[in-house]
Protein backbone atom coordinates (compact mmCIF):
# COMPACT_ATOMS: atom_id res chain seq x y z
CA UNK A 1 0.00 0.00 0.00
CA UNK A 2 2.84 2.38 0.83
CA UNK A 3 4.54 1.62 -2.47
CA UNK A 4 1.32 2.32 -4.34
CA UNK A 5 0.92 5.62 -2.45
CA UNK A 6 4.50 6.63 -3.25
CA UNK A 7 4.02 5.79 -6.92
CA UNK A 8 0.76 7.76 -7.04
CA UNK A 9 2.43 10.79 -5.42
CA UNK A 10 5.28 10.57 -7.92
CA UNK A 11 2.85 10.48 -10.83
CA UNK A 12 0.97 13.43 -9.41
CA UNK A 13 4.15 15.45 -9.02
CA UNK A 14 5.37 14.55 -12.50
CA UNK A 15 2.60 15.42 -14.93
CA UNK A 16 4.45 14.10 -17.98
CA UNK A 17 5.10 10.70 -16.41
CA UNK A 18 1.49 10.56 -15.25
CA UNK A 19 0.15 11.19 -18.75
CA UNK A 20 2.57 8.68 -20.26
CA UNK A 21 1.33 6.12 -17.75
CA UNK A 22 -2.28 6.89 -18.64
CA UNK A 23 -1.49 6.46 -22.34
CA UNK A 24 0.20 3.12 -21.69
CA UNK A 25 -2.74 1.90 -19.62
CA UNK A 26 -5.16 2.95 -22.35
CA UNK A 27 -3.09 1.13 -24.98
CA UNK A 28 -3.07 -2.06 -22.91
CA UNK A 29 -6.77 -1.64 -22.21
CA UNK A 30 -7.56 -1.35 -25.91
CA UNK A 31 -5.67 -4.56 -26.69
CA UNK A 32 -7.26 -6.37 -23.74
CA UNK A 33 -10.74 -5.20 -24.73
CA UNK A 34 -10.30 -6.51 -28.24
CA UNK A 35 -9.04 -9.89 -27.02
CA UNK A 36 -12.03 -10.25 -24.68
CA UNK A 37 -14.46 -8.88 -27.24
CA UNK A 38 -16.80 -11.45 -28.76
CA UNK A 39 -16.83 -10.81 -32.49
CA UNK A 40 -20.26 -11.56 -33.98
CA UNK A 41 -20.56 -10.79 -37.66
CA UNK A 42 -24.26 -10.47 -38.69
CA UNK A 43 -23.55 -12.44 -41.92
CA UNK A 44 -26.06 -10.34 -43.83
CA UNK A 45 -25.08 -8.34 -46.92
CA UNK A 46 -26.88 -5.24 -45.61
CA UNK A 47 -24.95 -5.11 -42.33
CA UNK A 48 -21.61 -6.88 -42.84
CA UNK A 49 -19.75 -3.85 -44.18
CA UNK A 50 -21.21 -1.48 -41.59
CA UNK A 51 -20.37 -3.83 -38.72
CA UNK A 52 -16.83 -4.59 -39.90
CA UNK A 53 -15.81 -1.01 -40.69
CA UNK A 54 -17.61 0.32 -37.62
CA UNK A 55 -15.60 -2.05 -35.43
CA UNK A 56 -12.45 -0.72 -37.07
CA UNK A 57 -13.29 3.00 -36.75
CA UNK A 58 -15.70 3.68 -33.87
CA UNK A 59 -13.62 2.26 -30.95
CA UNK A 60 -10.51 4.24 -32.00
CA UNK A 61 -12.60 7.42 -32.06
CA UNK A 62 -13.85 6.59 -28.57
CA UNK A 63 -10.31 5.95 -27.31
CA UNK A 64 -9.14 9.20 -28.94
CA UNK A 65 -11.84 11.24 -27.19
CA UNK A 66 -11.17 9.39 -23.94
CA UNK A 67 -7.53 10.41 -24.21
CA UNK A 68 -8.62 14.05 -24.37
CA UNK A 69 -10.99 13.59 -21.44
CA UNK A 70 -8.30 12.05 -19.20
CA UNK A 71 -5.70 14.67 -20.12
CA UNK A 72 -5.68 17.56 -17.65
CA UNK A 73 -3.95 19.83 -20.14
CA UNK A 74 -7.12 20.02 -22.26
CA UNK A 75 -8.76 22.35 -19.75
CA UNK A 76 -5.53 24.36 -19.53
CA UNK A 77 -5.47 24.69 -23.32
CA UNK A 78 -9.14 25.72 -23.47
CA UNK A 79 -8.72 28.31 -20.72
CA UNK A 80 -5.62 29.77 -22.34
CA UNK A 81 -7.35 29.92 -25.73
CA UNK A 82 -10.58 31.55 -24.51
CA UNK A 83 -9.22 33.86 -21.82
CA UNK A 84 -9.24 37.64 -22.39
CA UNK A 85 -5.91 39.02 -23.50
CA UNK A 86 -5.58 41.59 -20.71
CA UNK A 87 -1.96 42.52 -20.03
CA UNK A 88 -0.65 39.16 -21.20
CA UNK A 89 -0.59 38.31 -24.88
CA UNK A 90 -1.46 34.85 -26.14
CA UNK A 91 1.17 33.01 -28.17
CA UNK A 92 -0.41 30.81 -30.88
CA UNK A 93 2.74 28.68 -31.10
CA UNK A 94 2.37 27.68 -27.44
CA UNK A 95 -1.26 26.70 -28.01
CA UNK A 96 -0.27 24.65 -31.06
CA UNK A 97 2.46 22.90 -29.08
CA UNK A 98 0.03 22.00 -26.29
CA UNK A 99 -2.56 20.75 -28.79
CA UNK A 100 0.01 18.62 -30.63
CA UNK A 101 1.27 17.15 -27.35
CA UNK A 102 -2.26 16.21 -26.27
CA UNK A 103 -3.10 14.78 -29.68
CA UNK A 104 0.03 12.64 -29.85
CA UNK A 105 -0.72 10.99 -26.51
CA UNK A 106 -4.38 10.50 -27.39
CA UNK A 107 -3.49 8.70 -30.63
CA UNK A 108 -1.60 5.86 -28.95
CA UNK A 109 -4.60 3.79 -27.85
CA UNK A 110 -6.49 4.18 -31.19
CA UNK A 111 -3.36 3.14 -33.09
CA UNK A 112 -3.06 0.01 -30.93
CA UNK A 113 -6.72 -0.87 -31.54
CA UNK A 114 -6.47 -0.43 -35.32
CA UNK A 115 -3.25 -2.46 -35.43
CA UNK A 116 -4.68 -5.35 -33.39
CA UNK A 117 -7.91 -5.34 -35.40
CA UNK A 118 -6.12 -5.44 -38.74
CA UNK A 119 -3.73 -8.14 -37.57
CA UNK A 120 -6.64 -10.30 -36.43
CA UNK A 121 -8.55 -9.81 -39.68
CA UNK A 122 -12.05 -10.68 -38.46
CA UNK A 123 -13.54 -7.25 -39.07
CA UNK A 124 -11.89 -7.10 -42.50
CA UNK A 125 -13.36 -10.50 -43.37
CA UNK A 126 -16.82 -9.45 -42.25
CA UNK A 127 -16.69 -6.17 -44.18
CA UNK A 128 -15.34 -7.43 -47.53
CA UNK A 129 -16.54 -11.01 -47.80
CA UNK A 130 -19.32 -9.98 -50.22
CA UNK A 131 -16.71 -8.59 -52.64
CA UNK A 132 -14.95 -11.94 -53.16
CA UNK A 133 -14.82 -13.78 -56.45
CA UNK A 134 -15.79 -17.27 -55.34
CA UNK A 135 -14.44 -18.83 -58.54
CA UNK A 136 -10.87 -18.12 -57.38
CA UNK A 137 -11.25 -20.52 -54.47
CA UNK A 138 -12.54 -23.54 -56.41
CA UNK A 139 -15.96 -25.19 -56.66
CA UNK A 140 -17.56 -22.42 -58.68
CA UNK A 141 -20.64 -24.58 -59.06
CA UNK A 142 -21.82 -23.30 -55.69
CA UNK A 143 -22.93 -19.99 -57.21
CA UNK A 144 -24.07 -21.24 -60.61
CA UNK A 145 -27.69 -20.39 -61.21
CA UNK A 146 -27.89 -17.93 -58.30
CA UNK A 147 -29.24 -14.45 -58.70
CA UNK A 148 -27.18 -11.46 -57.64
CA UNK A 149 -29.08 -11.15 -54.38
CA UNK A 150 -28.69 -14.84 -53.56
CA UNK A 151 -25.00 -14.65 -54.39
CA UNK A 152 -24.50 -11.73 -52.00
CA UNK A 153 -26.31 -13.61 -49.24
CA UNK A 154 -24.14 -16.66 -49.93
CA UNK A 155 -20.90 -14.64 -49.73
CA UNK A 156 -22.06 -12.79 -46.62
CA UNK A 157 -22.20 -16.11 -44.73
CA UNK A 158 -18.47 -16.81 -45.24
CA UNK A 159 -17.42 -15.29 -41.86
CA UNK A 160 -19.99 -17.48 -40.08
CA UNK A 161 -18.63 -20.99 -39.68
CA UNK A 162 -21.99 -22.48 -38.67
CA UNK A 163 -23.91 -21.02 -41.62
CA UNK A 164 -21.52 -21.75 -44.50
CA UNK A 165 -21.69 -25.30 -45.86
CA UNK A 166 -18.51 -25.66 -47.95
CA UNK A 167 -15.71 -25.57 -45.38
CA UNK A 168 -12.85 -25.63 -47.91
CA UNK A 169 -14.09 -22.55 -49.74
CA UNK A 170 -14.68 -20.76 -46.46
CA UNK A 171 -11.17 -21.53 -45.18
CA UNK A 172 -9.56 -20.42 -48.45
CA UNK A 173 -11.56 -17.17 -48.56
CA UNK A 174 -10.86 -16.48 -44.89
CA UNK A 175 -7.11 -16.91 -45.32
CA UNK A 176 -7.13 -14.70 -48.41
CA UNK A 177 -8.92 -11.80 -46.71
CA UNK A 178 -6.93 -12.16 -43.47
CA UNK A 179 -3.73 -12.03 -45.49
CA UNK A 180 -4.82 -8.71 -47.01
CA UNK A 181 -5.89 -7.44 -43.59
CA UNK A 182 -2.54 -8.29 -42.00
CA UNK A 183 -0.73 -6.61 -44.88
CA UNK A 184 -2.78 -3.47 -44.22
CA UNK A 185 -1.93 -3.78 -40.53
CA UNK A 186 1.80 -3.91 -41.20
CA UNK A 187 1.49 -0.97 -43.59
CA UNK A 188 -0.36 0.98 -40.92
CA UNK A 189 2.35 0.23 -38.34
CA UNK A 190 5.05 1.18 -40.82
CA UNK A 191 3.29 4.44 -41.62
CA UNK A 192 2.84 5.35 -37.95
CA UNK A 193 6.45 4.48 -37.11
CA UNK A 194 7.78 6.40 -40.11
CA UNK A 195 5.69 9.44 -39.19
CA UNK A 196 7.01 9.37 -35.62
CA UNK A 197 10.55 9.03 -36.98
CA UNK A 198 10.09 12.03 -39.26
CA UNK A 199 8.77 14.13 -36.39
CA UNK A 200 11.77 13.20 -34.24
CA UNK A 201 14.28 13.66 -37.04
CA UNK A 202 12.93 16.85 -38.62
CA UNK A 203 12.36 18.79 -35.40
CA UNK A 204 16.09 19.59 -34.80
CA UNK A 205 16.33 20.88 -38.37
CA UNK A 206 14.11 23.84 -37.53
CA UNK A 207 14.83 26.65 -35.09
CA UNK A 208 15.55 24.94 -31.80
CA UNK A 209 15.17 28.19 -29.89
CA UNK A 210 11.55 28.53 -31.01
CA UNK A 211 10.83 24.97 -29.93
CA UNK A 212 12.41 25.54 -26.52
CA UNK A 213 10.42 28.74 -26.14
CA UNK A 214 7.08 27.08 -26.86
CA UNK A 215 7.95 24.12 -24.63
CA UNK A 216 9.00 26.39 -21.77
CA UNK A 217 5.88 28.54 -21.84
CA UNK A 218 3.56 25.56 -22.20
CA UNK A 219 5.10 24.12 -19.03
CA UNK A 220 4.81 27.53 -17.40
CA UNK A 221 1.08 27.76 -18.14
CA UNK A 222 0.51 24.33 -16.61
CA UNK A 223 2.63 25.04 -13.53
CA UNK A 224 1.09 28.49 -13.06
CA UNK A 225 -2.39 27.02 -13.01
CA UNK A 226 -1.36 24.39 -10.44
CA UNK A 227 0.31 26.99 -8.23
CA UNK A 228 -2.74 29.25 -8.47
CA UNK A 229 -5.03 26.38 -7.48
CA UNK A 230 -2.78 25.48 -4.54
CA UNK A 231 -2.65 29.12 -3.42
CA UNK A 232 -6.44 29.37 -3.63
CA UNK A 233 -6.80 26.19 -1.59
CA UNK A 234 -4.43 27.47 1.09
CA UNK A 235 -6.22 30.82 1.16
CA UNK A 236 -9.63 29.14 1.38
CA UNK A 237 -8.37 26.91 4.20
CA UNK A 238 -7.02 29.87 6.17
CA UNK A 239 -10.12 31.94 5.42
CA UNK A 240 -12.40 29.17 6.68
CA UNK A 241 -10.25 28.65 9.78
CA UNK A 242 -10.28 32.34 10.71
CA UNK A 243 -13.99 32.65 9.94
CA UNK A 244 -14.89 29.65 12.11
CA UNK A 245 -12.59 30.85 14.87
CA UNK A 246 -14.24 34.28 14.89
CA UNK A 247 -17.67 32.67 14.85
CA UNK A 248 -16.97 30.61 17.95
CA UNK A 249 -15.42 33.64 19.63
CA UNK A 250 -18.56 35.68 19.03
CA UNK A 251 -20.91 32.91 20.14
CA UNK A 252 -19.05 31.91 23.28
CA UNK A 253 -17.28 35.15 24.12
CA UNK A 254 -18.03 35.09 27.81
CA UNK A 255 -16.91 31.50 28.20
CA UNK A 256 -13.68 32.18 26.32
CA UNK A 257 -12.99 35.24 28.46
CA UNK A 258 -13.49 33.12 31.57
CA UNK A 259 -11.06 30.47 30.33
CA UNK A 260 -8.55 33.07 29.20
CA UNK A 261 -8.31 34.52 32.71
CA UNK A 262 -7.54 31.05 34.02
CA UNK A 263 -5.05 30.11 31.28
CA UNK A 264 -1.44 31.00 31.19
CA UNK A 265 0.05 33.86 29.25
CA UNK A 266 2.09 31.46 27.15
CA UNK A 267 -1.04 29.75 25.85
CA UNK A 268 -2.55 33.15 25.00
CA UNK A 269 0.59 34.11 23.14
CA UNK A 270 0.59 30.86 21.22
CA UNK A 271 -3.07 31.29 20.25
CA UNK A 272 -2.47 34.86 19.12
CA UNK A 273 0.55 33.78 17.13
CA UNK A 274 -1.41 31.00 15.42
CA UNK A 275 -4.27 33.36 14.63
CA UNK A 276 -1.83 35.96 13.32
CA UNK A 277 -0.16 33.37 11.08
CA UNK A 278 -3.54 32.30 9.71
CA UNK A 279 -4.45 35.91 9.01
CA UNK A 280 -1.11 36.47 7.31
CA UNK A 281 -1.91 33.63 4.93
CA UNK A 282 -4.99 35.56 3.80
CA UNK A 283 -2.63 38.07 2.12
CA UNK A 284 -4.86 40.97 3.07
CA UNK A 285 -7.96 39.53 1.39
CA UNK A 286 -10.53 39.15 4.16
CA UNK A 287 -13.88 39.71 2.44
CA UNK A 288 -15.91 37.70 -0.04
CA UNK A 289 -16.27 40.65 -2.40
CA UNK A 290 -12.51 41.21 -2.43
CA UNK A 291 -11.83 37.56 -3.20
CA UNK A 292 -14.38 37.56 -6.01
CA UNK A 293 -12.72 40.65 -7.44
CA UNK A 294 -9.28 39.03 -7.25
CA UNK A 295 -10.50 35.90 -9.04
CA UNK A 296 -12.30 37.96 -11.67
CA UNK A 297 -9.22 40.09 -12.31
CA UNK A 298 -7.06 36.97 -12.58
CA UNK A 299 -9.33 35.64 -15.31
CA UNK A 300 -9.91 38.86 -17.23
CA UNK A 301 -6.53 40.52 -16.84
CA UNK A 302 -3.65 38.25 -15.91
CA UNK A 303 -0.44 40.04 -14.92
CA UNK A 304 2.23 40.55 -17.51
CA UNK A 305 5.14 38.12 -17.56
CA UNK A 306 7.76 40.71 -16.66
CA UNK A 307 9.31 40.26 -13.22
CA UNK A 308 11.20 43.31 -11.90
CA UNK A 309 13.48 43.74 -8.92
CA UNK A 310 12.25 45.64 -5.94
CA UNK A 311 12.69 49.37 -6.38
CA UNK A 312 13.87 49.82 -2.83
CA UNK A 313 16.60 47.22 -3.17
CA UNK A 314 17.80 48.81 -6.39
CA UNK A 315 17.86 52.24 -4.82
CA UNK A 316 19.76 51.06 -1.75
CA UNK A 317 22.29 49.20 -3.87
CA UNK A 318 22.74 52.26 -6.02
CA UNK A 319 23.42 54.46 -3.04
CA UNK A 320 25.85 51.97 -1.59
CA UNK A 321 27.81 51.52 -4.81
CA UNK A 322 27.72 55.15 -5.85
CA UNK A 323 25.48 54.48 -8.85
CA UNK A 324 21.84 55.04 -9.64
CA UNK A 325 20.07 53.30 -12.51
CA UNK A 326 23.31 51.91 -13.85
CA UNK A 327 25.22 55.24 -13.82
CA UNK A 328 27.24 57.25 -11.30
CA UNK A 329 24.84 59.10 -9.03
CA UNK A 330 26.90 62.32 -8.95
CA UNK A 331 28.08 62.20 -5.36
CA UNK A 332 31.73 61.86 -4.56
CA UNK A 333 31.26 59.34 -1.78
CA UNK A 334 28.36 57.58 -3.44
CA UNK A 335 25.77 58.95 -0.99
CA UNK A 336 23.95 62.17 -0.22
CA UNK A 337 24.93 64.45 2.63
CA UNK A 338 21.70 63.85 4.50
CA UNK A 339 21.99 60.07 4.37
CA UNK A 340 24.03 58.45 7.07
CA UNK A 341 27.11 56.72 5.75
CA UNK A 342 27.40 53.05 6.64
CA UNK A 343 30.44 52.03 8.65
CA UNK A 344 32.31 48.87 7.71
CA UNK A 345 34.56 46.97 10.11
CA UNK A 346 37.07 44.37 8.99
CA UNK A 347 38.55 41.82 11.39
CA UNK A 348 41.66 39.79 10.67
CA UNK A 349 42.37 36.51 12.37
CA UNK A 350 45.91 35.68 13.45
CA UNK A 351 45.21 31.98 13.92
Curated annotation (Swiss-Prot):
Name of protein: Calcium homeostasis modulator 1
Short name of one Pfam family: Ca_hom_mod
Basic and acidic residues: bias regions: 263-281
Quaternary assembly: Oligomerizes to form hexamers and octamers. Does not form gap junctions. Associates with CALHM3 as a pore-forming subunit in a hetero-hexameric channel complex.
Glycosylated residues, chain numbering: 139
Localisation: Cell membrane; Endoplasmic reticulum membrane; Basolateral cell membrane
Disulfide cysteine pairs (residue numbers): 41-126, 43-160
Post-translational modification: N-glycosylated.
Superkingdom to which the source organism belongs: Eukaryota
Primary location group: membrane
Catalytic activity: ATP(in) = ATP(out); Ca(2+)(in) = Ca(2+)(out); Mg(2+)(in) = Mg(2+)(out); Na(+)(in) = Na(+)(out)
Role, per record: Pore-forming subunit of a voltage-gated ion channel. Has poor ion selectivity and forms a wide pore that mediates permeation of small ions including Ca(2+), Na(+), K(+) and Cl(-), as well as larger ions such as ATP(4-).
Source taxonomy: Eukaryota, Metazoa, Chordata, Craniata, Vertebrata
Transmembrane segment boundaries: 21-36, 49-71, 99-124, 178-203
Amino acid sequence: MDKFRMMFQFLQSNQESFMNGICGIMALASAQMYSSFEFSCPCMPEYNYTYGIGLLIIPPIWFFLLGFVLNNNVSVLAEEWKRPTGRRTKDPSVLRYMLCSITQRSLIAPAVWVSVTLMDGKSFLCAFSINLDIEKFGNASLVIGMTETEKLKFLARIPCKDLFEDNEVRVAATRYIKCISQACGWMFLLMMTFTAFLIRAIRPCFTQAAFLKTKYWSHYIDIERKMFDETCKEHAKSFAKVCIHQYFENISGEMQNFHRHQSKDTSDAEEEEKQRSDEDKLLGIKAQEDMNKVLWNWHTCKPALALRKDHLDTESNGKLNGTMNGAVNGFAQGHTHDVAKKEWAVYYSKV
